[in-house]
Amino acid sequence: MFKNTFQSGFLSILYSIGSKPLQIWDKKVRNGHIKRITDNDIQSLVLEVEGTNVSTTYITCPADPKKTLGIKLPFLVMIIKNLKKYFTFEVQVLDDKNVRRRFRASNYQSTTRVKPFICTMPMRLDDGWNQIQFNLSDFTRRAYGTNYIETLRVQIHANCRIRRVYFSDRLYSEDELPAEFKLYLPVQNKAKQ
């Protein structure tokens, strides 16, 4: 999808405020919902993915199962709200041995397991909004001893709220981020009466 696109800086694949946030995504819902709502904490539109079973409610990109993203930028960044329920996401990458590897992170697992084609790992989320930063190049090297070439697919499962999902060429400090890539929490008015 993005193979022939010049890739530097930031490449966003989901922005909850956009006119069609799931334009390049496919949705699967069983016993749950995927809808856009206003989050009270940030007073802004977000995408809510909720389901009784994490494996049957998710969004996946690209929408066409035969296509791949072709994103070479090595950092995946997701701005996600912890709903204090089970949550998992999965990223499929291609390495320099031409092997497709999957990385699955979840908040209900306690150990990391590396198998030939999938690496599952625990993820701890803070209360409220989180910025998940995933160094795909480093994970590929540490888990498989190979080099990251590109990201093929991203799948985000229930249960979470999503503000933005993007790739970047490196990790940026808060000051370096473009305004629309930051998560603004409304300033609490602490004036004393």
From Swiss-Prot:
Keyword entries, A-Z: Cell projection, Cilium, Cytoplasm, Cytoskeleton, Microtubule, Nucleus
Gene Ontology CC terms: axonemal microtubule; centriole; ciliary basal body; cilium; motile cilium; nucleus
Domain of life according to the entry: Eukaryota
Entries under InterPro entries matching the protein: CFA20/CFAP20DC, CFA20_dom
A UniProt-annotated Pfam family: CFA20_dom
Keyword Nucleus appears in the UniProt entry: yes
Swiss-Prot/TrEMBL GO biological process terms: cilium assembly; positive regulation of cell motility; positive regulation of feeding behavior; protein polyglutamylation; regulation of cilium beat frequency involved in ciliary motility
Nucleus recorded as keyword: yes
Subcellular location(s) of the protein: Nucleus; Cytoplasm, Cytoskeleton, Microtubule organizing center, Centrosome, Centriole; Cytoplasm, Cytoskeleton, Cilium basal body; Cytoplasm, Cytoskeleton, Cilium axoneme
Main location: nucleus
PANTHER family: ORF PROTEIN
General function of this protein: Cilium- and flagellum-specific protein that plays a role in axonemal structure organization and motility. Microtubule inner protein (MIP) part of the dynein-decorated doublet microtubules (DMTs) in cilia axoneme, which is required for motile cilia beating. Involved in the regulation of the size and morphology of cilia. Required for axonemal microtubules polyglutamylation.
Protein family (similarity comment): Belongs to the CFAP20 family.
Protein name per its UniProtKB record: Cilia- and flagella-associated protein 20
Species in which this protein is naturally found: Xenopus laevis
Native organism taxonomy: Eukaryota, Metazoa, Chordata, Craniata, Vertebrata
